[in-house]
Curated annotation (Swiss-Prot):
UniProt subcellular location: Secreted; Host cell membrane
Membrane topology of this protein: Multi-pass membrane protein
Keywords: Calcium, Cytolysis, Hemolysis, Host cell membrane, Host membrane, Lipoprotein, Membrane, Repeat, Secreted, Toxin, Transmembrane, Transmembrane helix, Virulence
SUPFAM superfamilies assigned: beta-Roll
Family: Belongs to the RTX prokaryotic toxin (TC 1.C.11) family.
Record note on domains: The transmembrane domains are believed to be involved in pore formation in target cells. The Gly-rich region is probably involved in calcium binding, which is required for target cell-binding and cytolytic activity.
GO cellular component term of the entry, any: membrane
Regions crossing the membrane: 232-252, 299-319, 361-381, 383-403
Protein's UniProt keywords contain Transmembrane helix: yes
Name this protein carries in UniProt: Leukotoxin
The gene coding this protein: lktA
A Gene Ontology BP annotation from the UniProt entry: killing of cells of another organism
Amino acid sequence: MGTKLTLSTLSNGIRSTLTATRGGLNRAGQSLTQAGQTLKNGAKKIILYIPKDYKYDSGSGNGLQDLVKAAEELGIEVQKEEGNDIAKAQTSLGTIQNVLGLTERGIVLSAPQLDKLLQKNKVGQALGSSESIAQNFSQAKTVLSGVQSILGSVLAGMDLDEALQNESDQLTLAKAGLELTNSLIENIANSVQTLDAFSEQISQFGSKLQNVKGLGALGDKLKNIGGLDKAGLGLDVISGLLSGATAALVLADKDASTAKKVGAGFELANQVVGNITKAVSSYILAQRVAAGLSSTGPVAALIASTVALAISPLSFAGIADKFDRAKSLENYAERFKKLGYEGDSLLAEYQHGTGTIDASVTAINTALAAIAGGVSAAAAGSVVASPIALLVSGITGVISTILQYSKQAMFEHVANKIHNKIVEWEKNNGGKNYFENGYDARYLANLQDNMKFLLNLNKELQAERVIAITQQQWDSNIGDLAGISRLGEKVLSGKAYVDAFEEGQHLKADKLVQLDSAKGIIDVSNTGEAKTQHILFRTPLLTPGTEKRERVQTGKYEYITKLHINRVDSWQIKDGAASSTFDLTNVVQRIGVELDHAENVIKTKETKIVATLGDGDDNVFVGSGTTEIDGGEGYDRVHYSRGNYGALTIDATKETEQGSYTVNRFVESGKALHEVTSTHTALVGNREEKIEYRHSNNQHHAGYYTKDTLKAVEEIIGTSHNDIFKGSKFNDAFNGGDGVDTIDGNDGNDRLFGGKGDDIIDGGNGDDFIDGGKGNDLLHGGKGDDIFVHRQGDGNDSITESEGNDKLSFSDSNLKDLTFEKVNHHLVITNTKQEKVTIQNWFREAEFAKTIRNYVATRDDKIEEIIGQNGERITSKQVDELIEKGKGKIDKSDLSQVVDNYQLLKYSRDASNSLDKLISSASAFTSSNDSRNVLASPTSMLDPSLSSIQFARAA
């Protein structure tokens, strides 16, 4: 036999059939286990071993010479020892030494030990004398031809697979199943030759089958098995085996339910194992009685319990799951077939094919294990039956092992068909990558599923054009197919796609957008007539670069396809004239190059983003890594408010160009979007295929620093952390966002927003707009004409002012609903929500002047105007007068009077403006010397600061 075996299952199979036996069988199990372990290194043949100096007498009738002749006829090597070059197995049973040996060269039958055994253990015709047993070895070539005949089972299994794959009719399926059963019958007959029970029943059954179309060959085989006497064993065995074939066909039925298939597994176990157990056990118990041995209940129970150990319905449930997997894959595949991809259907074909093989081999192994277990258990305590039990166990174990090895070949046969179909498809489609075609189909299906949502994005995002970029990431089905077909070197980790939408219509984006994942280019500058656009990264976009894979063998059946990435260090983003919004938080910038045992990132690499925005009022939401932004023309904002990528530290005090900032961030330990490399595993029987691929995941990391460079940026929005902003000498616009932020406008006319949190804001020099937002904020205006804003729900703010013509706007409160009172040196203003705005040291200078002789005021800590939501206002002078009048608190009636007077003044202004317009219109109808032209226009009392106040209200 030229087939190299892997007998890892032999040791397990023999061990499982012997563990329930007693006494000497324990030592037999140890011996065979050791032998099986040795044979794992590679048994290649059957060897009849004859020691160098062993003498035997051909005339003694012991049959050894016949055995040698039988081996030679079968082409089995007869090895006469020239040295100690064959490692023999250890003790098998007490008085039996090295009858059956398993070595690294092959399966060794020890001629002298077999000879001694046959001479020593002579029994009556019930079991056959040693001479007749030896004669049977030579005539029927029992043990040797039994091992060889298993090849028939392998071929039959492949025939069954082919029949199922070709969807043949039920008769052909039945024939293939019975051919498989027939091969098993031959193996059993050869393995238990001393059971003289098959002849008449098998012959009769064979004659009947000869009359059935398509089954004549099987009938011939059954009919012509001769040399056996009448007994009641045969029909039970045959019926059990046929039930097994039927169950195997049920397991192979792609339309059968899981419950039905699991039931078929139990049926197989009950019918095959049950009938065989009954027949074999009853026969051997009868032989024990004939030999004068015990046939008590415990012996029968031992036989039954040992056989029960060989039954594993769970294995059939596993097979049923395989067919269910095939069925679900086929259903899943239907949609993608319509999109031009049949990979899922190929996977279903593989699962169905290998499931058929599993069903066939499991049926055979179940029967073999039951027979071996029954014979071994029946032999307990009987020296006479020991050699038969040993040989039956050994040979059935070898058969099972050969089947398992052959099953791998059959699995590979199915996998090769898948491989060939993929290669043929690529050949017929101009060399296109089959697996890339799979990603294309996945993308198209996703696009179809989400089209309604995508078509509504123009409205939702308020953009004339929406650019949607979708990254199809690793697909496990595609990975399975690549591994099974041995084409892992061709598979991709994924593929990126781009779509465009305008006015609720889907456009082909290839002429509008350039997306090059290999070079790292995203160009959306061709905006056409669109004035606004939104660039949406629907799924995490993997880092740019190209992939290359290399498949290497790491073990006998183990392979790994290594991933090599030629990375590009940055994404280059180019925008045009439209006002665009980019959300970069879904662009993967962090690469986990080293992970610990818990999958935490301990070493990273970064891919930066370089964005050139062009014209338009653009918004950029920054992601997890280094970002360089040139805002170009227009009012451009950079947002750090999405994601969780560390607090900002901005120091622009030394910047020489307006809109230039360096933003430092420290991202504390936690989870962040990373690109990592993982391994996909696909199994083809014993063959294990590992394929490395990259994908995005929120990985835990130890923290990292990153630095952003901003140019021509008009406004920066902070994070949810505690940010620090230090402005330039130019006009800055900062929004702290959430967190406890520290914002210093420095020079320039700055717009400073605290956002949520208890912020500290200093306007510095210049006419600043300061909005503390929610939280208890500390606000300082500094020099210049500053505007402060407070809203209901903003909390309790404290304001410090020194110089300039400053204003405080309560943008959603009526002035007369506020409460003004003096608390120590401070003015405290309370709104209807009992939130307080404290203007520090409002009364300090005046009190010093009252108490200190000749004191000259050096500071003005007051706010010159306090304004309500409708523009009504009260001046600092009016506040002082009414506080003094009310003895520390402004009376509500006095405050209402101030508001009413302002409203009257406002109406007067409106009337004055209307009169101006009327006079201007009338003058067009008069001559230049008309006396009406000398009417004096009333002096406008409109405060030039109103435009600033209106801005404050709008804010």
